[in-house]
Amino acid sequence: MNYFELFSLSPSFELDTAVLSERYRELQRAVHPDKFANASEQDKRLAVQHTAQVNDGYNTLKHPISRAEHMLSLKGIDLSHESTTVKDTMFLMQQMEWREALEEISDCDDPDEAIEHLHQSFGEYRGDITAQLAQKIGSEEASVLEQAADLVRKLKFMDKLQAELERAEDALF
């Protein structure tokens, strides 16, 4: 299912989430199962299915990583069940540095500063990756789409690393 079509939106990585939310509410009102309380059983089931599709579509398009995965899947690149890893050696080295810095937070003289530094570093890197992804994901060229897929993999890693940083931060305070 093409969620962009469901929400009458142009397929774009850079999406106006306010418009998405407005369309979501409109669709929810139109297909909500309560509107079909006196309908046939088949119509009730269809309403429940449509509501589930609308909810899935909204949750997919609302988040940049899942939106990018959806855009790539529409072009034949499915990242949802893959175990492919990033092969970019510079990224892997940066990843190791970040992991070491995360492990050393509790031993730092100033854990607050270390945490702030990592937040800043993650944010800058994420911004760079997101900008590159926005440029590449609209392409129809297979090699460029593979580059976009690698960028999505990096963003997924960054999400995991961000969650680890937040857990480390919570453990300290």
Swiss-Prot record:
SUPFAM superfamilies recorded: Chaperone J-domain, HSC20 (HSCB), C-terminal oligomerisation domain
GO terms, molecular function: ATPase activator activity; protein-folding chaperone binding
Membership in a protein family: Belongs to the HscB family.
Protein name: Co-chaperone protein HscB homolog
Keyword Chaperone found: yes
InterPro entries, per the entry: DnaJ_domain (IPR001623), HscB (IPR004640), HscB_C_sf (IPR036386), HscB_oligo_C (IPR009073), J_dom_sf (IPR036869)
PROSITE patterns: DNAJ_2
UniProt keyword terms in alphabetical order: Chaperone
Annotated coiled-coil segments of the chain: none
